[in-house]
Amino acid sequence: MWSLALTLPSPSLVSVRSTKLGRSVSNGGRNWSGLTKLSEKSKTKRGNGLCCKAELSELAPVVSATYGVLLLGGGLFAYSKSGSKGSLFGGLTGSVLMASAYFLTKSPETRVLGDTIGLGAAFLFSSVFGFRLASSRKPVPAGPLLLLSIGMLSFFVMAYMHDSLPAISIPDPLPLP
């Protein structure tokens, strides 16, 4: 009988590798890289990363279109699943209201009207899903839809207040002598 033994070198406990910050020494699972260099680098150069600098008035058309598509999709899904004409009518109504809010919020002259229509539609669907949740006592599908509608309602309230209320000017404090 033949036997073949293959000997492999055992891994060392200390390994050294090169990184962008210099040499990194790893000892038994502990990484002792140039931590001072990393902290200095993070203090000197701040990356932009994922940063959204959009205002509510710029986000309102996207939010209203997304909410309208979700309402239409939910109405079509409920109609195909259970034949509910009420859900189909609600989905179509919500998508038409959100489409009008979408087109109105794209123009600065009609932005407040679009916010108002979005606010009214979100309030309407929050009420509908709240009543459905209270009457059926089943958390699905009325619960998540209620949370989504409350989120849209709060968004459109903030967008309406942002677009319709005038900016508050704070007077400069008295100069010190």
Curated annotation (Swiss-Prot):
FT transit peptide: 1-63
Alphabetical GO biological process terms: embryo development ending in seed dormancy; positive regulation of triglyceride transport
Transmembrane segments: 85-105, 111-131, 140-160
Keyword presence, Chloroplast: yes
Cellular component terms per the entry's GO annotation: chloroplast membrane
Entry keyword set: Chloroplast, Membrane, Plastid, Transit peptide, Transmembrane, Transmembrane helix
Main location group: plastid
Topology in the lipid bilayer: Multi-pass membrane protein
Localization annotation: Plastid, Chloroplast membrane
Pfam families assigned: Tmemb_14 (PF03647)
Entry-linked PANTHER family: PROTEIN FATTY ACID EXPORT 4, CHLOROPLASTIC, TRANSMEMBRANE PROTEIN 14, 15
Family per similarity comment: Belongs to the TMEM14 family.
Note: For all TMEM14 proteins, 4 hydrophobic alpha-helical domains are predicted. However, NMR structure determination of the human TMEM14A showed that only 3 of these helices are membrane-spaning while the amphiphilic N-terminal helix is probably located at the lipid micelle-water interface.
Stated role: May be involved in free fatty acids export from the plastids.
Stated name of the protein: Protein FATTY ACID EXPORT 4, chloroplastic
Organism: Arabidopsis thaliana
Source species taxonomy: Eukaryota, Viridiplantae, Streptophyta, Embryophyta, Tracheophyta
Gene that encodes the chain: FAX4
